[in-house]
Swiss-Prot record:
<keyword id="KW-0698">rRNA processing</keyword>
<feature type="binding site">
    <location>
        <position position="89"/>
    </location>
    <ligand>
        <name>[4Fe-4S] cluster</name>
    </ligand>
</feature>
<comment type="similarity">
    <text>Belongs to the class I-like SAM-binding methyltransferase superfamily. RNA M5U methyltransferase family. RlmD subfamily.</text>
</comment>
<dbReference type="InterPro" id="IPR012340">
    <property type="entry name" value="NA-bd_OB-fold"/>
</dbReference>
<keyword id="KW-0949">S-adenosyl-L-methionine</keyword>
<feature type="binding site">
    <location>
        <position position="171"/>
    </location>
    <ligand>
        <name>[4Fe-4S] cluster</name>
    </ligand>
</feature>
<dbReference type="InterPro" id="IPR001566">
    <property type="entry name" value="23S_rRNA_MeTrfase_RlmD"/>
</dbReference>
<dbReference type="InterPro" id="IPR010280">
    <property type="entry name" value="U5_MeTrfase_fam"/>
</dbReference>
<feature type="binding site">
    <location>
        <position position="380"/>
    </location>
    <ligand>
        <name>S-adenosyl-L-methionine</name>
    </ligand>
</feature>
<dbReference type="GO" id="GO:0005506">
    <property type="term" value="F:iron ion binding"/>
</dbReference>
<dbReference type="GO" id="GO:0070475">
    <property type="term" value="P:rRNA base methylation"/>
</dbReference>
<dbReference type="GO" id="GO:0051539">
    <property type="term" value="F:4 iron, 4 sulfur cluster binding"/>
</dbReference>
<comment type="function">
    <text>Catalyzes the formation of 5-methyl-uridine at position 1939 (m5U1939) in 23S rRNA.</text>
</comment>
<dbReference type="GO" id="GO:0070041">
    <property type="term" value="F:rRNA (uridine-C5-)-methyltransferase activity"/>
</dbReference>
<dbReference type="Pfam" id="PF05958">
    <property type="entry name" value="tRNA_U5-meth_tr"/>
</dbReference>
<keyword id="KW-0408">Iron</keyword>
<dbReference type="Pfam" id="PF01938">
    <property type="entry name" value="TRAM"/>
</dbReference>
């Protein structure tokens, strides 16, 4: 049988060619979407209603990716990024879009994902929780990179989809006092004899001061410790070192733990605060976290002596305020160190209607001592969601379920489970925890109807 040669398209020519495309919408990760030869093309940095010149960087069967070369016709939502490092640093990806445009996109994306995967189309969103668009982060981890040839240590954030460190002089989303410390810290670290043995630097702005956590891979000598101590005194900041075993040591002073306020003091109640060990997870946006906690209390409406289960409770971000309102609270967390700190926080706030447990929430929960009938359930899982935990709804039978999500995809999947079990979505709202980025957080309230 004769075989005929069929020439394949020259993919290298296709990738090098420049194209003019019209952008229709944004995907859930904030990239522009256009159409080309029957394929969807994803274009980071492009906005809806723009005409752009791009260069294809990847071709697949059903989609392609492209690099933005030039914006030929701008969207009215396009703005000039405020950060000089925006186009190289991997921290933010929506600074080129107005803040109102970002929020409108995030709300539309949230509704779209919930409609597609949870069948909740047609619902209205509650007002979004929004705050400052700049200098909102009270915590950030800066990467270090030591160049063996130049003997220079770079301090900054990693580039998008890369391990390369982009040196930065400022960060427009980091709290201003912390941003102002980046250049002085970079200079200090390069003066240390152990600069080749330094890991990341974490900066924290807490209600009881500013903190820096420096990761070290070997012990520092006395001269280096003296330089760190003098820097801490000059800049009025607590510095602590974290070694390979995860142990912390204060520099020049005893180790002090950062403290965040969860509920402000008012006429009816004292303030509720949370202390934590550097390295443990806490919400980085103080303004939005306070609003989120207040909204959770409003939506869940805890009553005195109600039995409320807080799964993925961390160090008590929601458990402490729930107990403050008189509920009998059970908090369960998968990280043992955070459970210990949650107990410390309960004692510090004089809250005794709280019990914390350590447990794997993806495992069989049937024999757990806390498993049983509850009045209400609060979920605040990591990005993977709470699918396994929701398989035990029949044993818990909560009247209300409040779900705080950092991943709308897992929220939609888990919402489908709740709807199948007789719950109805009562409220849904955006939490804009991370302005200038595509990240979407949300809060959903479900009530049992069957």
């Amino acid at each position: 049988m004769a075989q005929f040669f069929k020439a394949k398209p020259n993919s290298s020519k296709q990738l090098s060619a420049k194209l003019s495309l019209n952008v229709d919408q944004l995907d859930h990760l904030g990239a522009g979407i256009a159409q080309y030869q029957g394929k969807v093309v994803f274009i980071p940095g492009a906005l809806p209603d723009e005409t752009v010149t791009v260069q294809l960087t990847e071709q697949k069967k059903n989609y392609a990716r492209a690099k933005l070369i030039k914006v030929d016709a701008q969207s009215p939502e396009r703005v000039e990024p405020e950060c000089p490092h925006y186009h190289t640093c991997g921290g933010c990806d929506l600074q080129h879009m107005s803040l109102s445009g970002q929020r409108e996109h995030k709300e539309a994306a949230l509704l779209d994902i919930m409609a597609k995967f949870a069948g909740t189309e047609g619902g209205a969103l509650s007002p979004a929780l929004t705050g400052e668009g700049w200098h909102y982060r009270r915590r950030a981890r800066l990467a270090t990179l030591f160049d063996k040839n130049t003997k220079h240590l770079s301090l900054g954030f990693r580039a998008a989809s890369s391990s390369n460190v982009v040196p930065i002089s400022q960060c427009q989303v980091l709290a201003k006092p912390l941003s102002d410390l980046i250049v002085p810290f970079a200079k200090l670290l390069n003066q240390l004899s152990a600069k080749a043995s330094l890991g990341h630097l974490e900066l924290i702005a807490a209600d009881n001061g500013h903190f820096a956590v420096l990761r070290i891979t070997k012990a520092l000598n006395d001269k280096d410790l003296a330089k760190l101590s003098a820097f801490a005194e000059q800049h009025q900041i607590y510095i602590c070192l974290q070694d390979n075993e995860g142990q912390f040591q204060g520099v020049g002073v005893e180790l002090v733990l950062p403290v965040y306020q969860l509920l402000d003091e008012n006429a009816q109640s004292d303030a509720v605060s949370l202390s934590f060990t550097p390295g443990n997870f806490v919400q980085v946006n103080s303004q939005i976290n306070k609003a989120m906690v207040a909204q959770a209390m409003d939506w869940l409406a805890p009553a005195p002596d109600e039995r409320i289960l807080d799964l993925f409770c961390g160090m008590g971000n929601f458990s402490l305020p729930l107990a403050k309102m008189g509920a009998d609270v059970i908090g369960v967390e998968g990280v043992a160190e955070m459970v210990s700190q949650a107990r410390v926080n309960a004692k510090a706030n004089n809250l005794d209607k709280l019990t914390f447990y350590h447990g794997d929430l993806s495992a069989d929960l049937s024999l757990e001592p806390w498993m049983g009938k509850i009045d209400k359930l609060l979920l605040d899982p990591a990005r993977a969601g709470a699918f396994e935990s929701l398989q035990w709804l029949k044993k818990m039978k909560p009247r209300k379920v409040l779900y705080v999500s950092c991943n709308p995809a897992s929220l939609a999947r888990d919402s489908a489970v709740l709807l199948e079990r007789g719950y109805r979505l009562q409220r849904l709202g955006l939490i804009d925890m991370f302005p200038q980025t595509h990240h979407i957080e949300a809060m959903a309230l479900f009530e049992l109807t069957k």
